[in-house]
Amino acid sequence: MTEIFSDTSIRQLSQMLLSLIFFHISEYILAITIHGASNVTLSSLLITKHYALAMLLSLLEYLTEIILFPGLKQHWWVSNFGLIMIIVGEIIRKAAIITAGRSFTHLIKINYEEHHGLVTHGVYRLMRHPSYCGFLIWSVGTQVMLCNPVSAVAFAVVVWRFFAQRIPYEEYFLNQFFGVQYLEYAESVASGVPFVN
């Protein structure tokens, strides 16, 4: 039981808590900064029941493994690689949000609005959905940092599947809004999510 209070677990759990706080607060602050406080709700914190359950299950895996297999959590290079993934994912996602500005929203827009524009510069030159790419890297990184093998695989599969379904839906409307301009962009730039065209 003392493994729960070891230096390793304190470091890993502290980094996880700080990563979660930074991610969610920064998403909310960016939404308010870009769209104005009157246009932003608490949903911009991006905390849903399913997300909270996934994080709770990952914590349960962590605690179970640190008690039963404490050596599993001692792989510092794996944990540090996960921390690097978190930082890289954050940078990509935040660069996407800042670059897109008012064209970025947490919800898929199904109606064209005057301020919408097709963003193809900055990080969008490299991929069509950098915010999804960043979140995928970030979410899997949280589990790699905790040395959670089951949750790392589960997060990768679930988040990838979510975006594999979301991207075609979102791109249907982007095609409606921007027509040939979007089709040409989509043909020349990868989605940013592996195996999703």
Curated annotation (Swiss-Prot):
Record carries keyword DNA-binding: no
GO CC terms, sorted: endoplasmic reticulum; endoplasmic reticulum membrane
Membrane topology: Multi-pass membrane protein
GO molecular function terms attached to this record: carboxyl-O-methyltransferase activity; protein C-terminal S-isoprenylcysteine carboxyl O-methyltransferase activity
Gene3D superfamilies xrefs: 1.20.120.1630
Regulation: Inhibited by farnesylthioacetic acid (FTAA) and N-acetyl-S-trans, trans-farnesyl-l-cysteine (AFC).
EC number, UniProt record: 2.1.1.100
Tissues/organs with expression: Expressed primarily in flowers, stems, leaves and roots. Almost not expressed in siliques. Detected in root tips and vascular tissues of roots, cotyledons, petiols, hypocotyls, filaments, pollen grains and the distal and proximal portions of the gynoecium.
Highest taxon, organism lineage: Eukaryota
Essential cofactor(s): Zn(2+)
PANTHER family: PROTEIN-S ISOPRENYLCYSTEINE O-METHYLTRANSFERASE (PTHR12714), PROTEIN-S-ISOPRENYLCYSTEINE O-METHYLTRANSFERASE (PTHR12714:SF9)
Protein name: Protein-S-isoprenylcysteine O-methyltransferase A
Source organism per UniProt: Arabidopsis thaliana (Mouse-ear cress)
Lineage: Eukaryota, Viridiplantae, Streptophyta, Embryophyta, Tracheophyta
